[in-house]
Amino acid sequence: MTEMRSAKIMSGRVFAGARALYRAAGVSGDDMGKKPIIAIANSFDEFLPGHVHLNKVGRIVSEAIKEAGGIPREFNTMAVDDGIAMGHTGMLYSLPSRDIIADTVEYQCNAHCADALICIPNCDKVVPGMLMAALRLNIPTVFVSGGPMEAGTTVLADGTVKSTDLIDVMYATADDSVSDEELLNYEKTVCPTCGSCAGMFTANSMNCLTEAIGLALPGNGTILASHSYRKDLFERAAKQVVKIAHQYYDDSDDSVLPRSIATKEAFENAMTMDVAMGGSTNTVLHILAMAQSADVDFTLDDIERISHTVPCICKASPSGKWEISDVHRAGGITGILGELDRAGKLHTNVHSIDYPTLEAKLADWDIMRPTCTEEAQQMYKAAPGHIISPEPWTHTTLFDSLDRDRTNGAIHDIDHPEIHEGGLAVLRGNLAPDGCVVKTAGVPPEIWKFRGPALVVDSQEQAIEVILNDTLKPGMALVIRYEGPKGGPGMQEMLYPTSFVKGKGIGKQVAMLTDGRYSGGSSGLAIGHMAPEAANKGPVALIRNGDIIDIDIEARSVNVELTDEQLDERRRELEAGDGYVAHRNRHVSQALKAYAAFARSADKGATRDPELINKLSGLD
């Protein structure tokens, strides 16, 4: 038996005050020291459709924990909506919020001696922030997200009915052929329900990744927020966290702990799945940060290795025609994992919060196997209800059948990939010696090789200006620098630039490169995370208008056609002048300056520099 963390304050005279406060908060004296305290890390807020319903989720989870024999204690973290923060200085705060969320969960659980944890995230930075905290804390933990929203249904001016999502309205804003009335129609219809934005954007990619790494139950990444099966998932997750808490404390079974589950093999599995489904490039940042929190040696080199050997077998929006509900109908994350397993691409001996091995889980949940349970087959029939409402679990709509077509369906088998290269790739060259990332699943084949003159800007705002005023021409490479973790600071997403080039009709004729990030909703030849960043003396700071940029995705290369001697000469000129300073007008708050002071480059997950922190604090 392992002593519960809460035991230290649940007995003895010295902690009578702590117990008095717990009693005042509603904890029964009869339960103190006998039942595990289960922290519920919720992220409800009314700014985000992905989180607007999570207060109701918290109540469901709390009641289920009580019924299962735990003591639920709920608290909230912040949640930044990238779609609302996008395109203005609000986006500077998005990535830094990830680390603050991780701190919040760590602080709350350690300050109050929580025995176990259930996390209720949904949107972009909340999922990785909570994952980082869980891996730091290493107490029994289960994740259950709020779920994806349904895709929209928009009737176009010509009467065509189109499946839409948030990215469609952003494309339309820069398309001069779309009238204000048509734009308003998009605005009203592309986001019909609560939930994280439809499509394989960052939020849904991260919720799928959590399932793949073993810290969430099947369906976590793909059951729609509007479907009644999502409510069932919340109840099952709540019971599971109490179960594994008892396994750890009553049976001393440390296999249920996050660090026992999220091993290097599990990280490799999760990244393999991510590459196969063409997830958001932001997942690269977050999985690197998670690995550091878990003390797992998993680096950009591992991601590069995986991307060379795993094809893309699932292309959901924005890279393809399929929506998240289509991926769910095809078997969801266990469907993708099943195909990867049959191709010998996974470590099947890893375990999860609910199964002793991945092999055992796939036997029950992979819809292509004869052993797949009736429960699994029924769950994967959960379909959109096509009801416009912010309320969750409003319907019980089911597909008539499952999508088992592995040649032309939403999930392909390894012999019929969407593209033979992985959906994500790491590029290197004299422009990014420490690496950069591109979502290959979203790059048209005709521009996998690109060569053209650079148009250089020092901010996202300047990038938007040169796109909308038509300074950016077909054949050019738009270089957006000083937007990295330090240089931004905050490593902004560039969804507006990628959306606007499509709205202008040149999305297949230009390249974009940045030391910042791209949204999970971005597609096209959009290369991000260039390391070292400009503010860290990276070569991208040396580029000038007209320099020839050469990109070859198949060769995994990104270069500027300058010699080492020419780059060295430019570096000397720059350092003799203003140095590595962005030419723009931007106010940076004290909070963002504090983030910038400790931020490492993208190839390290844009995490805080532990060596610098230790040096300045004087603490080990």
From Swiss-Prot:
Q: Which residues form the active site?
A: 519 (proton acceptor)
PROSITE patterns per UniProt: ILVD_EDD_1, ILVD_EDD_2
Name one process (GO BP) from the record: isoleucine biosynthetic process
Residues with the modification N6-carboxylysine, per the entry, are: 125
Question: Would the keyword NAD turn up in this protein's UniProt record?
Answer: no
Instruction: State the superkingdom.
Output: Bacteria
Q: Which pathway features in its UniProt record?
A: Amino-acid biosynthesis; L-isoleucine biosynthesis; L-isoleucine from 2-oxobutanoate: step 3/4; Amino-acid biosynthesis; L-valine biosynthesis; L-valine from pyruvate: step 3/4
Q: Which InterPro entries match?
A: Dihydro-acid_dehy_C (IPR042096), DihydroxyA_deHydtase (IPR004404), DiOHA_6PGluconate_deHydtase_CS (IPR020558), ILV_EDD_C (IPR056740), ILV_EDD_N (IPR000581), IlvD/EDD_N (IPR037237)
Sequence positions that bind Mg(2+): 82, 124-125, 493
UniProt xrefs under SUPFAM superfamilies: IlvD/EDD N-terminal domain-like (SSF143975), LeuD/IlvD-like (SSF52016)
Cofactor stoichiometry and binding remark: Binds 1 [2Fe-2S] cluster per subunit. This cluster acts as a Lewis acid cofactor.
Q: Which NCBIfam families match?
A: ilvD, PRK12448.1
Family matches, as PANTHER family? D-XYLONATE DEHYDRATASE, D-XYLONATE DEHYDRATASE YAGF-RELATED
Q: What is this protein called?
A: Dihydroxy-acid dehydratase
Supply the gene name.
ilvD
